[in-house]
């Protein structure tokens, strides 16, 4: 006899354990599971737990060489999704020993690796993760965090203002630098490389870095304010990425940028460590996120990608606007904005938060609202996101009829007016338009911007909404 019973047995016999009491050190996951017809939810939930931890499709004799009870993932609860006839939320607990310390890459390889192609499931979505303090403590997290960034920039009591330079591709380095100067001179705190600006034939990275550094130092001297431009260090190799970050540091600029999903978590974490060691802020763009998070029944919810970024490291991340051209429902967006900024967030299913999360003082990340926003949105953005945010107007700055600098002036005046009104106790949600109109009486730049964008709306319902 070989000493073990060969063959295939149902996952639920080993991996479905409704009596399990979760531990403080477990990583907890909430999966939205859509089983194939005829597959019971317990078997589907157990299959997810098995395939994302120790299981394989058949019994193997090497199972006897380890303690499966110590290492296996466990599906400990299953809930039916309200309003859906074949969807369930399966809760899975993973022992901490399954994961390498300080590695988002390894965590995701286990939890969202092969299991998403599993035949017994029609669809699978990771809705949320609870990262235990014991695991959080193995990560550096954001290079600096919100308070250190404010201290570096000497900017307090208001959201920060940014602008993505457009057209995103095709400008020469000198013309690009000119646009950066005009926007910063007009009153913005930051300008930004677009996510797909790396080092193309029309504008090599080194030329762009030099002209942008010249632009921001000139604007800094003339305004007396600290300025920044997000220099995109994303590259084809990690070595090249770090080389670009080193050059940015040598120029003396305050901030660089990375596309964390296309660049990858390993590269991102390396860059975040470099940025902390060398005093650079790190702006994160989420290019490719909607491929992963847009579908309601399959993929990974952005709140999980946001948590992963806070662990991997970044001082800013794009988070949707609620009011602009890109996807984002208000309660869901504010749920993951709190997960980015706050030290402790309570479970709140009305905002899509499945687990209480304690970040044990890991630095916070500034959410960046960007995409199809303009001066009329300023009161809503100020009210929704509060002071600890970056409001980024690309077309809403560069599309101003009088040019880039007046576009920047219009946005700065609108922001200052909204912050002043809020501090005086006015209701931005109700009086927003009136506040902007009042401010435009003494700012011709704002008046012109108000006229151009008064009719622009993006009336599409969000795809990713809460279960009712």
From Swiss-Prot:
This protein's name: Ribulose bisphosphate carboxylase large chain
Family the UniProt entry places it in: Belongs to the RuBisCO large chain family. Type I subfamily.
Main location: plastid
Organism encoding this protein: Datura stramonium (Jimsonweed)
Annotated site, Transition state stabilizer, chain positions: 325
Top-level taxon of origin: Eukaryota
Binding-site residues for Mg(2+), renumbered to this chain: 192, 194-195
Role according to the record: RuBisCO catalyzes two reactions: the carboxylation of D-ribulose 1,5-bisphosphate, the primary event in carbon dioxide fixation, as well as the oxidative fragmentation of the pentose substrate in the photorespiration process. Both reactions occur simultaneously and in competition at the same active site.
Coiled coil: none
CDD domains assigned to the protein according to its UniProt record, in alphabetical order: RuBisCO_large_I
Keyword terms of this UniProt record: Calvin cycle, Carbon dioxide fixation, Chloroplast, Disulfide bond, Lyase, Magnesium, Metal-binding, Methylation, Monooxygenase, Oxidoreductase, Photorespiration, Photosynthesis, Plastid
N6-carboxylysine, modified sites: 192
Gene Ontology MF term list: magnesium ion binding; monooxygenase activity; ribulose-bisphosphate carboxylase activity
Keyword Oxidoreductase: yes
Lineage: Eukaryota, Viridiplantae, Streptophyta, Embryophyta, Tracheophyta
UniProt subcellular location: Plastid, Chloroplast
EC number: 4.1.1.39
């Amino acid at each position: 006899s070989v000493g073990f019973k060969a063959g295939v047995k149902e996952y639920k016999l080993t991996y479905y354990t409704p009596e399990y009491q979760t531990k403080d050190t477990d990583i907890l996951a909430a999966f939205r599971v859509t089983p194939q017809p005829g597959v019971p939810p317990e078997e589907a939930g157990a299959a997810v737990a098995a395939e994302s931890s120790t299981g394989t499709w058949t019994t193997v004799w090497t199972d006897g060489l380890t303690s499966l009870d110590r290492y296996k993932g466990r599906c400990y609860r299953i809930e039916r999704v309200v309003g859906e006839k074949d969807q369930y939320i399966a809760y899975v607990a993973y022992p901490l020993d399954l994961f390498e310390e300080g590695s988002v890459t390894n965590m995701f390889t286990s939890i969202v690796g092969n299991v998403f192609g599993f035949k017994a499931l029609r669809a699978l979505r990771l809705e949320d993760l609870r990262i235990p303090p014991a695991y959080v403590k193995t990560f550096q997290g954001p290079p600096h965090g919100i308070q250190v960034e404010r201290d570096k920039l000497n900017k307090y009591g208001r959201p920060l203002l940014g602008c993505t330079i457009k057209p995103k591709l095709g400008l020469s380095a000198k013309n690009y630098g000119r646009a950066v100067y005009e926007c910063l001179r007009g009153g913005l705190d930051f300008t930004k490389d677009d996510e797909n600006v790396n080092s193309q034939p029309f504008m090599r990275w080194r030329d762009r870095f030099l002209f942008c550094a010249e632009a921001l130092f000139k604007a800094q001297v003339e305004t007396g304010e600290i300025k920044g431009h997000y220099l995109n260090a994303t590259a084809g190799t990690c070595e090249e990425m770090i080389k670009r970050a080193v050059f940015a540091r040598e120029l003396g600029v305050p901030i660089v940028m990375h596309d964390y999903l296309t660049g990858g978590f390993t590269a991102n974490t390396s860059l975040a460590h470099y940025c902390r060691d060398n005093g650079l802020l790190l702006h994160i763009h989420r290019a490719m996120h909607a491929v992963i998070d847009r579908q309601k029944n399959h993929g990974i919810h952005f709140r999980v990608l946001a948590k992963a970024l806070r662990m991997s490291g970044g001082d800013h991340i794009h988070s949707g606007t609620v009011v602009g051209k890109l996807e984002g429902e208000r309660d869901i967006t504010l749920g993951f904005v709190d997960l980015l900024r706050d030290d402790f967030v309570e479970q709140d299913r009305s905002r899509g938060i499945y687990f209480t999360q304690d970040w044990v003082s890991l630095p916070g990340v500034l959410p960046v609202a960007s995409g199809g926003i303009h001066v009329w949105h300023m009161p809503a953005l100020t009210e929704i996101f509060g002071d600890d945010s970056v409001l980024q107007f690309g077309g809403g700055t560069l599309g101003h009829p009088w040019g880039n600098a007046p576009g920047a002036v219009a946005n700065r005046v609108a922001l200052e007016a909204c912050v002043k009104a809020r501090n005086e106790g006015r209701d931005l949600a109700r009086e927003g338009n009136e506040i902007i109109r009042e401010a435009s009486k003494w700012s011709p730049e704002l008046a012109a911007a108000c006229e151009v964008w008064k009719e622009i709306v993006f009336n599409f319902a969000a795809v990713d909404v809460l279960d009712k």
